[in-house]
Every structure is written in structure tokens, then in C-alpha cells.
From Swiss-Prot:
One of its GO terms (biological process) is iron-sulfur cluster assembly. Keywords: ATP-binding, Chaperone, Nucleotide-binding. This is Chaperone protein HscA. Belongs to the heat shock protein 70 family. SUPFAM superfamilies: Actin-like ATPase domain (SSF53067), Heat shock protein 70kD (HSP70), C-terminal subdomain (SSF100934), Heat shock protein 70kD (HSP70), peptide-binding domain (SSF100920). Coiled coil: none annotated. The lineage of its organism: Bacteria, Pseudomonadati, Pseudomonadota, Gammaproteobacteria, Enterobacterales.
Length: 616
């Protein structure tokens, strides 16, 4: 008689069998896939031994190609060859056209304002293009590992917002992949270096890829990876080096026409080739569109110097956020192919006062870190060796009365995280509450970013302050935010998942943090004034209700004194004198003390009416 094998729920019947997992670095210029084999993380090459996969897709009526074959078609069929699609992820069409006016694609807007690219294969959005790149990487991994993947960890820039992260998840699902989690690229690099070298202390991860720049300040201690602060620029990378050099070559060659897409591509290819060559040589010869000439490393350095300086300014801000000085940094990890540029390594070394780490190929280090994390999450090894703590870059909170922002989760809080805070109603009989979710560091709503609005209805009609609403903010491991509001006595609730249609601009992220420091004193004063005005409004609202109900308890003289005090409070509450408003509130309290006592006595008598002392 055959016996049925029964295993514990959630456990494999063959616990010794390794599950197949991969880490994917979905890059702007190039992408990679890596896995852990025999305890070592390694990137997986194609049939020709190439580890990088150009993030380029060429579309035709009967299909598409991805990678090198697609990139080779770029010059001949620019409109149907999509590259750097990561820059378009989560952005509106208007935003893309404003940021990248020279893109050679035929764009059309969908009903929600998101971009659609008109290709020979039809209208495609950035999510679909990204999915095709992910499919190619997954196919490479499945062939190399001789099986289907059980899960993947995909890396994203630290500054990707909710919409961009969600778009990446959607692309993975469209590619048929199970996403174990999204992982910030600098954090993935820290995993790769942290496990290999065992260093403990503060580490800076300088990640300059093709399309984005991220700086993360981390503390590694006893296997714990804690991100102290993050910063960067979501639209600055090696692609910008390429375009600056291409424009320089255009000027030298005297090419004025920008409408010829083929020439545009030739110029860009020549710039990329020259940039790579100048990492090893002092001079390179360029031959493009019938023009021949020389470019020196010094000329190239002059072109990109301002961009490199921008990255160092972001480094300085991140260090300040983390509360550390450059000399406190134990190691500087270099990530991204653009960190091969000698000027970048030189300036970064000067800034931090130490030679940057480049032991792991900067093109591969992110994918390797993602593979290590995927191996843990899929269940192949215990995660007791390592705890990973990411952070949110900007504070999250709610609008409260008076246009104030109440922060629920401060910036640089480690994620995943859930925080709850109780709020109450402002008016008698209030049955609904508007929940306005904010992001930013300032004290007033007008100075912060609106993320979402929703309403909680069905609140029982109680006196002001009688209903209690608990608002819970939950940020998952991928940085996506869910907000739930629940009235505690009835259990009625409403919730929302925040998915902005497009993200912050480059300047907004930096300025929101900078302004919070520049206007700190001014903001505190503005908050104190707003809070006093809210309290004045609450006192006057409550007094009006009391007078309407029980004016008969007052003599004419008493009523006049209270009316005078209330009128004075109403007048000073229109001004900007915090102390005057506070004194006026105290005066109203003083003038109404006897009135409040009589109302209390009356309420007690009404409650006792018809009852004996023994019953009480």
C-alpha cells in the first residue's frame, strides 16, 4: 500500500532542494541578471559571454529583439528602437517631453496622460518595454539554471517614487516573474560588499549609472545594514556625459541639422566609444559623419566637470542628513559603469579623503547584491546573518486643522514600517473626515507635497472631540504607502494606496529638504500661530453652542462680559500676534468659568431627576 507524504504547511516536501532565484539590475543603459551558485553570487552571460544586456528593444510588426541586436538597429530605425526607457517609468507624457525634448520617438498620450510610444508593433507604454527587457533576462537565467525562476529581486534607484516602483512591479508581472521584493540599488551594492569584506562602520555608496545618480550613507554593524540617509538625482547619469560629448563633437564637426535621427545616433555612438576609450587613454580619434578629429581627456573632463560637482553636492547633503562628516566614512563603494570615468573617481576620492572601492565590477555589483538577497528571500539560506533596513527619503503625514502638517512617519525612518496616530472631530455632529496625505519636511500644508486625498464617512454624530479616528500609515519593503482611517467605536474604515501619476522633479526633492532647514525657525513660528488660531476657533465654536443652549443661566451683565471677551478673541485671532491670541483665549476661559460651572450643575440635576439618593 502506497503511503501519502504529508509535509508541514508552507514547507517543501523536499527541503534539501534549492529553489531558483535571481537578482536583476534593471538599468537605464544596461541590465544584468545574477544568481547564487555554490555559495557564490555571479552574473549570468549570454551565449557569447557578454554579461551586460543593453536596455534597448527594437520593435517590428512581426516581433521584437532585445539587447545588442536591438541596439545595432538604432541608427537605421530610431523611432522603433526604444532605449533608456527607465527614465520614462512612472512619468507623465508632459514631464517626459519637458525633460527630454530630443527623444526621437513618436509619443501619444493615453487618457490618463501617461506616455504611449507609437511603434511598428503598435502603441506601447514604458511598462511593456521594460517587461520585454525583463523577459530576456529571465530567459537567460532559466536557460543557464535549467529551470524556471521561483522568484526575483529587482533593483530600483533609491529616489524612485511610488509610481515608478509600481511600474517596475507591473513590468515584472507582465514578464511572468514573481517579485520577491524591490531593492534600492545602493543597498544592493552594500549587501555585495558587506558580506564579502565584513567591514563594519559607515559606508557611502556612490551610484552613478546611465540615467540616475544615488548616494546612500549606510552603517554596517554585526550584519545589520541600516541606511542612515539617501540622496541623489533621478535624471543625472552617464547618458548625460554621452550627450554632452555628442553635442561637443557636433559643434566641432559643424553639424547643424538635429532632425536627422541617423546622424543623431551616429554622434551618440561616437561619443560613447570616445568616453570609454578616454578612461584608459589621454587622447582619442573620432570619425563621424565625414569629420575626423581628436578629443582629449582634459576636454572631456571640462565638459562633465559641472555634472560631477552636482553629484558631490548631493553627497554633502546626504552626509549632513546622516549626521556624519566625510572623514567618518570608512569606505566608499563605487557603483555603475559611469564610475569608471577617471575624473569621477578622482573627485570622489578627494571629497571623501580616501580611495574608493572598485574591487567588484561596478557594472555587476548591484546585480550581485540583488542575487544574494533573492537567495535569502526564496528560502535557500537563513537570513539570520543579515538584517536589511531601508529608509523613506521624505516625511509622511496628514493635514490637520489650520493647514498644519502632522508628521506620522519622519524621514529616514527604516522600512517596512507601520505607524498609527489618533485624531478627533472638530465640530459637533461631524459625520465625515477628509484625510489629506502629505509628503515633506515643512510645517504647513502649502509648503509640502500632496500625495492623496480620501474621505472617512459614517462617523457617529457626537460632540466635537467625541469620535476618535485612528489613522495608520504602512510603508512596505518596496516603499509603497497604504493609509487606513478607522473610527474606533464603530469600526467603519476607509483606505487608499498612494500611487502618484508621476514623481517629483529633480529640484523638488533637494529643495524640500533644504527649505526645511532654511525656514526652520520661520516654520515653527508659523505653526505656533496656526495652532493658536485653531484653538481660538475651537473655543469660539464651543462657546457659541453653549450660549445657544443655556443663555438663560446668565444675567445680562454676565452675558455682556462673555460677548465682549469672545469678540476680542475673534478680532485678535485674525492677526499674527501669538501671545495676544493666547491671552484672549485665557480671558474667555476666565469669563466663562462660572457659566461652565452652572451648566455642569444643571446637567447633574437633570441626570438625577426622578432618582433617589439610594439609587445613585
Amino acid at each position: 500500500m502506497a503511503l501519502l507524504q504529508i509535509s508541514e504547511p508552507g514547507l517543501s516536501a523536499a527541503p534539501h532542494q534549492r529553489r531558483l532565484a535571481a537578482g536583476i539590475d534593471l538599468g537605464t543603459t544596461n541590465s544584468l541578471v545574477a544568481t547564487v551558485r555554490s555559495g557564490q553570487a555571479e552574473t549570468l552571460p549570454d551565449h557569447e559571454g557578454r554579461h551586460l544586456l543593453p536596455s534597448v528593444v527594437h520593435y517590428q510588426q512581426q516581433g521584437h529583439t532585445v539587447g545588442y541586436a536591438a541596439r545595432d538597429n538604432a541608427a537605421q530605425d530610431t523611432a522603433n528602437t526604444i532605449s533608456s526607457v527607465k527614465r520614462m517609468m512612472g512619468r507623465s507624457l508632459a514631464d517626459i517631453q519637458a525633460r527630454y525634448p530630443h527623444l526621437p520617438y513618436r509619443f501619444k498620450a493615453s487618457v490618463n496622460g501617461l506616455p504611449m510610444i507609437d511603434t511598428a508593433a503598435g502603441l506601447l507604454n514604458p511598462v511593456r518595454v521594460s517587461a520585454d527587457i525583463l523577459k530576456a533576462l529571465a530567459a537567460r537565467a532559466s536557460e543557464s539554471l535549467s529551470g524556471e525562476l521561483d522568484g526575483v529581486v529587482i533593483t530600483v534607484p533609491a529616489y524612485f517614487d511610488d509610481a515608478q516602483r509600481q511600474g517596475t512591479k507591473d513590468a515584472a508581472r507582465l514578464a511572468g516573474l514573481h517579485v520577491l521584493r524591490l531593492l534600492n540599488e545602493p543597498t544592493a551594492a552594500a549587501i555585495a560588499y558587506g558580506l564579502d569584506s565584513g567591514k563594519e562602520g559607515v559606508i557611502a555608496v556612490y551610484d552613478l549609472g546611465g540615467g540616475t545618480f544615488d548616494i546612500s550613507i549606510l552603517r554596517l554593524s554585526r550584519g545589520v545594514f541600516e541606511v542612515l540617509a539617501t540622496g541623489g538625482d533621478s535624471a543625472l547619469g552617464g547618458d548625460d556625459f554621452d550627450h554632452l560629448l555628442a553635442d561637443y563633437i557636433r559643434e566641432q564637426a559643424g553639424i547643424a541639422d538635429r532632425s536627422d535621427n541617423r546622424v543623431q545616433r551616429e554622434l551618440l555612438d561616437a561619443a560613447i566609444t570616445a568616453k570609454i576609450a578616454l578612461s584608459d587613454a589621454d587622447t582619442v580619434r573620432v570619425n563621424v559623419a565625414g569629420w575626423q578629429g581628436e578629443i582629449t581627456r582634459e576636454q572631456f573632463n571640462d565638459l562633465i566637470s559641472a555634472l560631477v560637482k552636482r553629484t558631490l553636492l548631493a553627497c554633502r547633503r546626504a552626509l549632513k542628513d546622516a549626521g556624519v562628516e566625510p572623514q567618518d566614512v570608512l569606505e566608499v563603494v563605487m557603483v555603475g559603469g559611469s564610475t569608471r570615468v577617471p575624473l569621477v573617481r578622482e573627485r570622489v576620492g578627494e571629497f571623501f579623503g580616501r580611495t574608493p572601492l572598485t574591487a567588484i565590477d561596478p557594472d555587476k555589483v548591484v546585480a550581485i547584491g540583488a542575487a544574494i538577497q533573492a537567495d535569502i528571500l526564496v528560502g535557500n539560506k537563513p537570513d539570520s546573518e543579515m538584517l536589511l533596513l531601508d529608509v523613506i527619503p521624505l516625511s509622511l503625514g496628514l493635514e490637520t486643522m489650520g493647514g498644519l502638517v502632522e508628521k506620522v512617519i519622519p524621514r529616514n525612518t527604516t522600512i517596512p514600517v507601520a505607524r498609527a496616530q489618533d485624531f478627533t472631530t472638530f465640530k459637533d455632529g461631524q459625520t465625515a473626515m477628509s484625510i489629506h496625505v502629505m509628503q515633506g519636511e515643512r510645517e504647513l500644508v502649502q509648503d509640502c507635497r500632496s500625495l492623496a486625498r480620501f474621505a472617512l464617512r459614517g462617523i457617529p454624530p457626537l460632540p466635537a472631540g467625541g469620535a476618535h479616528i485612528r489613522v495608520t500609515f504602512q510603508v512596505d519593503a518596496d516603499g509603497l504607502l497604504s493609509v487606513t482611517a478607522m473610527e474606533k467605536s464603530t469600526g467603519v474604515e476607509a483606505s487608499i494606496q498612494v500611487k502618484p501619476s508621476y514623481g517629483l522633479t529633480d529640484g523638488e526633492i533637494a529643495s524640500m529638504i533644504k527649505d526645511s532647514m532654511s525656514f526652520a525657525e520661520q516654520d515653527v513660528k508659523a505653526r505656533m500661530l496656526a495652532e493658536q488660531k485653531v484653538e481660538a476657533a475651537r473655543v469660539l465654536e464651543s462657546l457659541t453652542g453653549a450660549l445657544t443652549a443655556d443663555a438663560a443661566l446668565l444675567s445680562a451683565a454676565e452675558r455682556q462680559c462673555i460677548d465682549d471677551a469672545a469678540a476680542h478673541l475673534s478680532a485678535v485671532a485674525q492677526g499674527d500676534d501669538v501671545d495676544a491670541i493666547e491671552q484672549a483665549i485665557k480671558n474667555v476661559d476666565k469669563q466663562t468659568q462660572e457659566f461652565a460651572a452652572r451648566r455642569m450643575d444643571q446637567s447633574v440635576r437633570r441626570a438625577l431627576k426622578g432618582h433617589s439618593v439610594d439609587e445613585v
